[in-house]
């Protein structure tokens, strides 16, 4: 499981780290742990894209209602993935999305205001039963 205290970041850079196994999003600010949020991530059959990405586009009140009240798009080259709110709050804490990161609307609204464009987003962790990389 991801443990925020083990990460060392550049002093001024904000960063988001998402642990798919734990369904947790950690926000670092000024190089220090700032806030931990529960989230929903992709199903094992439609996984969230593990790797290092960046927030490249943000919108308040996206037209597509299932995205909740905020959308923060990531620069994943093979699809459209982002961090967003939800119209299904019961889904938070589960592997249930098509790969995006879902948050409670009040949490994504708070995070949205803290995250500038270009913020690094690291998606880490394994799904249960997934083989460990050599």
Give the label of every model feature segment.
Residues 4-13, 43-50, 59-134:
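Exported/periplasmic cell-wall-interacting domains
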Residues 2-44:
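A structural motif detector for short, solvent-exposed N-terminal "entry" segments of globular domains
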